[in-house]
Amino acid sequence: MAVKVNKEFCSFCGKRQDEVLILIAGPNNTYICDECVEKCYQIVRENKKTSYNFELKDIPKPEQIKKILDEYVIGQERAKKILSVAVYNHYKRIKAKEAGLSLDDVELEKSNILLIGPTGSGKTLLARTLAKILNVPFAIADATSLTEAGYVGEDVENVLVRLLQACDYDVKAAQKGIVYIDEIDKIAKKSGINPSITRDVSGEGVQQALLKIVEGSVVNVPPQGGRKHPHQEFIQVDTTDILFICGGAFVGLEDIIKQRLGKSRVGFEAEIKKVDKEQDLLELVEPDDLIRFGMIPEFIGRFPVIATLRELTEDELVRILVEPKNALVKQYQKLFELEGVKLTFTEKALREIAKEAIRRKTGARGLRAIMEDIMADIMFEVPSLPGVKEVIIDENVVKNKEKPKLIFEQAV
């Protein structure tokens, strides 16, 4: 008697009927097993979770955007207001276009943003938080790694590859995303007596290459990044509605502003001090100052919104340590809480940490490194110390590397 062979198997994973719990039949002798159904459902669920579709009514008003920025970014009030308005107007323009509203009578230009401020003043955090508020894809690129096509380094199109990767290559979502390009001041034109001796492959050439992307055009993007080659398939990305935010320290820009104001000459020093006291010199920046710095006019023209950030004060650095939702002190306190231990920082300790960040000229960015240095030994020791109920960090721990005070539970 012939043995009947069971030929039914899952068309997705190839497992036979006796290897799975359920095998569901479809048309044309196709089947899917319960395991693959569960995987498909999980994929659909994840895609819904990371959906970037949003309606105009879902875009927070400028006041709401700033309020959320306040939860993560301390200080920089003027910059937060400028960014809130610019981002709101940018996405309002997109939704008006999607709704089919006529914009023929007035051309609404894209509000790309240029952030100018010292290291650790919050430029990257502002851009990242904006993307989080709006639930849009976000990517960060470093301008120093970009070079002209044909030279060692990254093509400018690679900044769009990162954006595509951030939303699993959902082109429609990427086309509403935010790209932050850091250290944009490092691609300023080289200057000197004879600047043409060596080709400026990471300066003016990169600015020219970025022009096409930031102004809004359809760009051929290599899907896996890297250099383009003739046989490679490209993904077409329309950058018209992508918001580009560029940030840089622009060291020396203040001197250019002073020269323009005519306040670097003898007899005007008192007036310079007055300007410095009343408002940061950077707030007086004009496009011509950036052009003199080394940015090309066409590039600066693509960034109509300029927001300046000032160096953070000691008080603001202390607030950064304790106030934001992701404040470092809160994070360490939670880690100690999981060990059943209370962690306390004295006010003087927090101020010493802030002073050290100012001394290192690292701003808020350097706070974590300082905290890690302070906490490394005690975090190593506490889990092995029985009966510890509180750890107190005072100024001597920060300044003199002394041991923190330990409070133990009293034996019954």
From Swiss-Prot:
HAMAP family: ClpX
Binding site for Zn(2+): 10, 13, 33, 36
GO molecular function, one term: ATP binding
Protein name as it appears in the record: ATP-dependent Clp protease ATP-binding subunit ClpX
Keywords: ATP-binding, Chaperone, Metal-binding, Nucleotide-binding, Zinc
PROSITE patterns found in the cross-reference section: CLPX_ZB
Residues annotated as domain ClpX-type ZB: 1-52
InterPro entries registered for this protein in UniProt: AAA+_ATPase (IPR003593), ATP-dep_Clp_protease_ClpX (IPR050052), ATPase_AAA_core (IPR003959), Clp_ATPase_C (IPR019489), Clp_protease_ATP-bd_su_ClpX (IPR004487), ClpX_bact (IPR046425), P-loop_NTPase (IPR027417), Znf_CppX_C4 (IPR010603)
Positions of ATP binding: 118-125
Subunit structure: Component of the ClpX-ClpP complex. Forms a hexameric ring that, in the presence of ATP, binds to fourteen ClpP subunits assembled into a disk-like structure with a central cavity, resembling the structure of eukaryotic proteasomes.
Lineage: Bacteria, Pseudomonadati, Aquificota, Aquificia, Aquificales
Gene3D superfamilies noted in UniProt: 1.10.8.60, ClpX chaperone, C4-type zinc finger domain, P-loop containing nucleotide triphosphate hydrolases
Stated family: Belongs to the ClpX chaperone family.
One GO BP annotation of this record: proteolysis involved in protein catabolic process
Biological source species: Aquifex aeolicus (strain VF5)
Function: ATP-dependent specificity component of the Clp protease. It directs the protease to specific substrates. Can perform chaperone functions in the absence of ClpP.
GO CC, one annotated term: HslUV protease complex
